[in-house]
């Protein structure tokens, strides 16, 4: 599970959110990755001086985040009316100097060059991609950055869905995530996300399984320990109810067909058979 900050919009509240995430990481059995979403939205008091807000987050808050070990990644919302490619690059470059890799939000509404910049800077993932050009796909093919689709966000906002079929047919991998947040995707239901991927994004059931497991693990840099049932990896997995086929798992959208949740070999949901 990845948990992002980004809703504090000032030093005290961003650090508070990240400290809460750090505590959850220590107390919860599920693997948690924390992301400092430094450039998420522009506070009203910085409406006409965005550069000052970027300077605050990059040059004042980020060093404290790094010093206290509060983030596994940084993130920015690179979009018209929010943060520019140059501002995103400023954050990524500063974080790299402090040993923190990046994950970024790009191409949700407009194509402004964020994908190319993120791939050149070895971002771990690029999230959204509802708008995607052939040039963006070619850039992604040359890099090691995971495209991530967020279909529940498209559903809630009634915007186009990430062209997953186009991405896969181009020879690229794709991951799926809920984008669970109060503004654009108020649902953490991964079952629904997977069904949307099949229904709205024309993904095949086996592609959805791969996107929501191993590729999702890669997007969080835990693919060596999680994401597949493999010798040497942690025994964290789900067991479904009896099904006639893999497709049935996503066909009955809104249904929970998970019988057991196992985390590192221990059943945390469901009963032992």
What is each PLM-predicted segment?
Residues 256-273:
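Short peripheral tails and domain-boundary helices/loops at the edges of structured domains
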């Amino acid at each position: 599970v990845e948990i992002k900050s980004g809703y504090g919009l000032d030093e005290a509240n961003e650090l508070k959110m990240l400290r809460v995430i750090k505590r959850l990481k220590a107390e919860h059995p599920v693997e948690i990755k924390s992301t400092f979403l430094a450039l998420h939205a522009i506070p009203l008091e910085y409406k006409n001086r965005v550069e000052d807000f970027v300077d605050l987050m990059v040059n004042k808050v980020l060093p404290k985040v790094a010093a206290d070990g509060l983030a596994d990644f940084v993130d920015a919302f690179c979009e018209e009316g929010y943060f520019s490619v140059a501002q995103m690059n400023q954050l990524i470059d500063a974080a790299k100097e402090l040993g923190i890799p990046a994950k970024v939000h790009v191409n949700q509404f407009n194509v402004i060059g964020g994908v190319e910049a993120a791939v050149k800077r070895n971002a771990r993932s690029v999230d959204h991609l509802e708008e995607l050009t052939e040039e963006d796909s070619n850039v992604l093919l040359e890099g090691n950055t995971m495209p991530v689709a967020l279909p529940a966000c498209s559903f809630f906002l009634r915007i186009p869905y990430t062209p997953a079929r186009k991405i896969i047919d181009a020879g690229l991998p794709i991951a799926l995530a809920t984008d669970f947040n109060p503004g654009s995707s108020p649902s953490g239901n991964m079952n629904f996300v997977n069904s949307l991927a099949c229904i709205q994004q024309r993904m095949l059931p086996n592609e959805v399984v791969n996107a929501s497991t191993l590729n999702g693990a890669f997007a969080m840099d835990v693919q060596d320990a999680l994401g597949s049932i493999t010798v040497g990896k942690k025994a964290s997995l789900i067991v479904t109810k009896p099904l006639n086929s893999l497709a049935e798992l996503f066909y009955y959208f809104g249904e929970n067909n998970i019988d057991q949740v196992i985390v590192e070999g221990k059943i945390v949901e469901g009963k032992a058979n």
